[in-house]
Regions:
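Thiamine diphosphate
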Residues: 2-205, 210-211, ...
């Protein structure tokens, strides 16, 4: 790298002539950090209201009321918002290192003694790497261990090593396990105490960092095991979960301007599924569209289709379409670009519905 120097002169007090000062290296220019879709990237739209670390603050607040609550992390406390809990309750936080299986085994032991553990890591590590421990140490004895998986679906641009696009498909078949996919900060804050009070293991698909705040504008309260109709509509019925509920609501408003009346039913609990709410959302001869931040294989779309076929009393099945990630490993890149590419953006949802109704 070429190094530049500066030159200046000062008068010589003896001769009156100007002599060069000692040459000094120029101060190096400050490096400009490139903008990346790092693991801490936010899913919030520009200008959208957000709440910082809702999970960490909700867990810390719960621990003030319930001395049984403990937190564990597999060396990712900062990136799962568990650092908020650790700072508030340092003697009830356990840093387990990069050992997800060990973390879940330890959490199971804590639950056996009557504690209520929340164990956090990335979703890919909780589901792919530690599945056997979750199954046999936690789910089989039906222990109240709450597994918190950050970066669910396409919420990071780091590629297949960190994108948990199939976590629901992996876990839906596990007996005793309750699965929650929250939409926003409101969902997360209200879900935490209900997960702690639940009799049995849970898996929370965590949105972390600056999480959008959306559901406070609706007459909504999180209820474990229940879905909620957020908006009525006669033409199209959206059945959505996770962050795709905020996209569903935004798309519904856009479609309304085109004269398309869209209902939105939010399904925060994937398992057990609220079959009655699913059946109601499919009534009226409307186009039914499922929306999920997950592969279209083994997630909400499959759960809804199965519910309508085997659990509902509908005389005829509705026309059903699905919006979700493709059955493939995804690219790395900036989140807005990836959401457009794979059909999760509001623009993509609006376009898909318009084409289906054409």
């Amino acid at each position: 790298m070429t190094q530049t120097t500066t030159h200046s002169t000062t008068p010589d007090t003896k001769t009156g002539t100007a002599e060069p000062e000692t040459m000094r290296p120029a101060a190096p220019a400050k490096a400009v950090k490139p903008k990346t879709s790092a693991m801490i990237a936010s899913i919030a739209e520009p200008g959208q209201r957000t709440t910082a670390a809702p999970f960490g603050h909700a867990l810390a607040a719960l621990a003030e009321q319930d001395t049984r609550v403990v937190g564990l992390s597999a060396d990712l406390a900062k990136y799962t918002d568990m650092h908020i809990f650790a700072a508030a309750h340092p003697h009830r936080f356990f840093q387990m290192g990069m050992a997800e299986a060990l973390m879940l085994g330890a959490a199971a032991g804590m639950a056996e003694t009557g504690l209520v553990p929340f164990a956090s890591t990335y979703s890919v590590f909780a589901t792919r790497r530690a599945y056997d421990f979750l199954c046999l140490d936690i789910a089989e004895p039906n222990l109240n261990v709450n597994v918190v998986g950050a970066l669910p679906g396409l919420t990071t641009g780091y590629g297949p090593s960190h994108q948990a696009t199939e976590d629901l498909a992996i876990l839906r078949g596990m007996p005793n396990l309750t699965i929650v996919d929250p939409c926003d900060s409101v969902d997360i804050e209200q879900a935490v105490p209900q997960l702690a009070a639940h009799d049995g293991p849970t898996y929370l698909r965590l949105l972390r960092g600056k999480v959008p705040t959306v559901l406070d504008e609706y007459d909504y309260r999180f209820q474990l095991g229940k879905a909620a109709e957020l908006r009525t509509g006669r033409d199209v019925s959206f059945i959505s979960t996770g962050l795709m509920t905020m996209r569903a609501l935004a798309a519904a408003k856009r479609l309304e301007a085109d004269g398309i009346d869209v209902a939105v039913t939010h399904v925060p609990t994937i398992k057990p599924l609220d079959h009655a709410a699913i059946a109601r959302a499919a009534e009226g001869g409307r186009l039914v569209v499922t929306l999920e931040n997950h592969t279209i294989v083994g997630g909400l779309a499959d759960a809804v289709a199965s519910s309508l076929i085997f659990e509902s009393q509908l005389g005829s099945l509705p026309q059903l379409r699905r919006i979700g990630l493709p059955d493939e490993f995804l690219l790395a890149g900036a989140l807005p670009t990836l959401h457009d590419r794979y059909g999760l953006s509001t623009d993509a949802v609006v376009t898909a519905v318009q084409e289906w109704l054409a």
